């Protein structure tokens, strides 16, 4: 019999939820534990009252242990959580009432802060020894620091509110079993083919880095000696960014009279806008060709989505690394060289994509993603996870 402290400690410390589920798969122990771990305190109290001879005293960990040692079954846990669904939906709908109207009125905003570190804006300001008068200090604060913090606050609101509205589509779907409290690296469970599988929800735009690799060719790996599902066809070829830079550099040299700025600090969209503003037929033809190519890199088939899912696992940052089952919602512009984060406010359209995906879900429809991770020595190794995704692109 699995000891509670063993399984509890293993889960709290793991960066590989899939491995955890594999270790404790016998008698569906992992599933039962995770369902119990996902209950809030009032729910744990009710479970202990109904299915255990123990009293209901103690903190969250003690109540979780008492519920774990009770007679409650997976089916009874599922039925209990299902009874809470209507209450949760009503609560979320009341909280979110009218907020879509605010999103509709939002200006286009960028985050403006890397890794949510607002202090990175404030530190240079407070350490700036060139501000020699109070007036110049206030001018720097009002015109440089505060606009960036305001932008970050607006983006954070837009991002969080969009998340909350879109998550309601999952809460309402009968295939999805919600968690009743936060549980690390699991947002909900999916019921499929008599299984209950934990999933983490990932909203993300398709990264520039993915488009660069896709432009070099992402190919299915048929060599079973390598764990990665895909590989890059030719990483010596110029990628999307390099092609745009090369054309811009040559165009700038041939058209010195235009006084085009140097490459440093310019992004794909900046370079294309500068080329387009020249009105040169060759430059415009090049941009149109690059946009057509860019559109072809936006996944439209299950196989293409599989490669995008693989990329997001393989190249995830080491700071927040986790190997867990994931349900991705990807956002992208087909003919613009900007990320698709502003599309997140299109909650109705994204909701329809979610309904279509969940309405046709089967075990066979999920992707088994295999990847080798080597961005951090302590995490290096072969990993396997289940993945699902939907994409909204314009």
Task: Give the positions of each predicted feature.
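Active-site beta-strand-loop-beta-strand hairpin of nuclease catalytic cores
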Residues: 180, 189-201
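Nucleic-acid endonuclease domains
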Residues: 1-184, 203-394
């Amino acid at each position: 019999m699995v000891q509670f402290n063993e399984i509890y400690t293993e889960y709290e410390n793991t960066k590989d939820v899939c491995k955890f589920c594999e270790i404790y798969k016998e008698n569906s122990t992992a599933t039962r534990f995770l369902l119990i771990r996902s209950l809030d305190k009032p729910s744990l109290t009710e479970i202990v009252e109904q299915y255990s001879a123990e009293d209901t005293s103690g903190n969250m960990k003690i109540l979780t242990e008492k519920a774990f040692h009770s007679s409650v079954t997976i089916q009874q846990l599922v039925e209990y959580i299902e009874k809470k669904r209507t209450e949760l939906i009503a609560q979320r709908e009341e909280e979110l009432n009218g907020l879509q109207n605010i999103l509709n009125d939002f200006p286009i905003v960028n985050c403006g802060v890397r890794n949510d570190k607002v202090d990175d804006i404030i530190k240079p300001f407070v350490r700036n020894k060139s501000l020699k008068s109070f007036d110049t200090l206030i001018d720097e604060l009002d015109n440089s620091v505060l606009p960036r913090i305001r932008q970050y606050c607006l983006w954070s609101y837009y991002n969080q509110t969009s998340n909350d509205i879109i998550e309601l589509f999952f809460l309402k779907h009968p295939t999805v079993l919600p968690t009743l409290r936060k549980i690390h690296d699991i947002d909900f469970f999916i019921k499929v083919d008599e299984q209950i599988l934990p999933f983490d929800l990932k909203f993300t735009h398709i990264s520039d880095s993915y488009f660069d690799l896709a432009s070099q060719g992402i190919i299915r790996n048929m060599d079973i000696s390598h764990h990665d599902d895909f590989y890059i066809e030719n990483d010596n070829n110029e990628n999307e960014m390099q092609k745009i830079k090369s054309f811009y550099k040559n165009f700038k040299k041939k058209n010195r009279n235009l006084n085009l700025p140097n490459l440093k600090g310019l992004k794909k969209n900046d370079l294309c806008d500068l080329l387009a503003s020249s009105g040169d037929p060759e430059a415009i033809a090049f941009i149109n060709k690059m946009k057509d190519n860019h559109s072809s890199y936006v996944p439209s088939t299950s196989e293409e989505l599989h490669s995008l899912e693989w990329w997001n696992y393989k190249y995830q940052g080491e700071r927040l690394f986790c190997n867990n089952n994931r349900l991705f919602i990807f956002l992208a512009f087909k003919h613009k060289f900007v990320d698709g984060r502003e599309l997140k406010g299109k909650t109705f359209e994204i909701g329809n994509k979610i309904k279509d995906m969940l309405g046709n879900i089967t075990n066979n429809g999920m992707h088994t993603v295999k990847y080798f991770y080597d961005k951090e020595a302590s995490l290096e190794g072969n990993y396997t996870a289940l993945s699902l995704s939907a994409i909204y692109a314009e």
